[in-house]
Amino acid sequence: ASETAELVFQDCRVHKSQVLGKVGDGFIQAMKVLDGGRISIASLALGIAKGAYDASLKYSKECQQFGQPISSFQGISFKLADMATQIEAAELLTLQAAALKNNGEKCTKESAFAKYYASEISVKVSTEAVQIFGGYGYTKDFPVEKFYRDSKLCTIGEGTSEIQKMVIAREILK
């Protein structure tokens, strides 16, 4: 769950001595903060995806069908390969955005890339994890059901995936 609230400043007056920055620049300042927030959400999504992947990898090596671990079946091994590749790509995008931010460079496009891709693959990886676990993946006895639920929030917070696409499009079309 997340705590979400509406702030209303109707007929609100602020004394000159209490104004931070220049009057009218609040939106610009808020947008600058979003870059860092998007990197944070990308990191969160990446952690969820890694947790789902790690649990799936372990389970697929332990779970036996027809006298062999399910990881030996091509359908499962291909899922694991896709998951690992997507996680690696998301991590590189996230690290690139974080490095730019840490160096004080503009990172609007890169943070949107990272947030969009990492959050979307978090959902995909978590969904595949549930598939690998089968019916167990939907129960609270195993961790992947929580990864599955938690991953979706990452596609919403700090701007939905659709907003990230708008930001990316705006940046690449400049």
PLM region descriptions:
Residues 6-12, 16, 22-25, 31-174:
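Alpha-helical interface subdomain recognition
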Residues 1-3:
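Fold-level recognition of mixed alpha/beta catalytic cores in primary-metabolism enzymes, strongest
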